[in-house]
Amino acid sequence: MVHSGSISELFGLASCHNRFHFRPETSRAVQELSHIKLAGVSPPPTVLATCLEAIPSHFRVLDLSGITHLDSLPPSELPATLNSLQLPQVPLLSPPPSVVSRGIHAIRQYLRDLKHGSSPWWKLKLQVVGRHTSGKSSLVDAMMRWSTHGATAFPYRGRAKLDRTVGVDVVDWQPLPSQSHPPGHPLRLRVFDFGGQDVYHAGHSTFMSDDAMSLLVVDLSLGVAETCRCMVQWLDMLQFQTPGSVVLVVGTHLDMCGTEVRRTVEGVNATVRRWQSERQQQLRATIEALEGSGVVGAMHRASQLRRAVGDVEVDDMGQVVGGGVRVVGELLCVSCTTGEGIGDLVRHVVSIMATGETIAPDLSSTPQLFPRLGKPVPHTYAAFTNALSTALTSKRSAAA
């Protein structure tokens, strides 16, 4: 690791001791500096942690944006005197974006807590979206019933017609029995079931995130044209609000479709492919126009649009870090009443989350679509989220 800019002439890092050392002839000049920038290839976590903790107290700004292959900050005690931390443009796996966005104080606390104790994080967010009355809540109930009782949970009558989701309903779910997972790797999902009425759409962005998986639910009984229209409407919304999210399209009411199922499935899959192609072409045309203008603001906007163009972006570590909405696989058809397709859907969701592939789940593999899965988090972070989950579960049970 080296120090770039003028600091390289004043500061030396003795890698054999992993400590910062001052040259006697430059010691006074170093004391007058407040900004330090580290650059080069990211060292092993233990080495980087030692470097971070050894930064002299008079420095106020730490710039790590020049370090390549940096995917995580190690557990460490950042100097209390630092008031600014500049990171690479590629989002880190640790701390997560929700911590980084709150600034240096939150990052310092997170790394300190991580140093004092951590455990692997096997929880992910599942967003269930779609038109009202498409069967989103019944689908969530059916998947949870299958996880607990298997095929004996069906037939299932579903929710009453007047039992509609108001705003968003949140519930925790372990999709597979504990014995189906490797020791210590029980995948758990926090399910956000979003109300589909138009009046709730404006508030969805408050609870949505682009590092989650979205189930886009469509009602197959509406016919090909209406099913495709509703799906495109929600794909556009997801592209706007969560451009990096992974989307799986699920068709409900399979038992009510009769012989039209095959035609509907083919129509939906063709519409998805056409939607992805059209959105990419539209955004690329806009990008070219903005870049051709030469205006600074337009160039910045072009850079933002490139991130949403729909092309998957991969960082130096081979992990997916951005891009537009990623529709994985083809339409999956289920019946919440008979249970047909529910078990396959649950296993499909787990496979995609755990491996990024539509194959049998193996949680010991390295996930690409959800790279934070299995990474260590502080015990304090896990304890807080577990307490919140317990409170939500208790509230749901009381309401039931």
Across the structure, where does each feature detected by a protein language model lie?
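Concave beta-strand-loop units of leucine-rich repeat
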Residues: 1-6, 12-18, 35-43, 64-69, ...
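A structural signal for leucine-rich repeat
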Residues: 2-30, 47-56, 73-80, 96-103
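Short, flexible boundary segments at extreme N-termini or domain junctions of P-loop NTPases and their
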Residues: 80-127, 131, 180-181
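Canonical P-loop GTPase G-domain recognition
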Residues: 98, 102, 108, 256-363
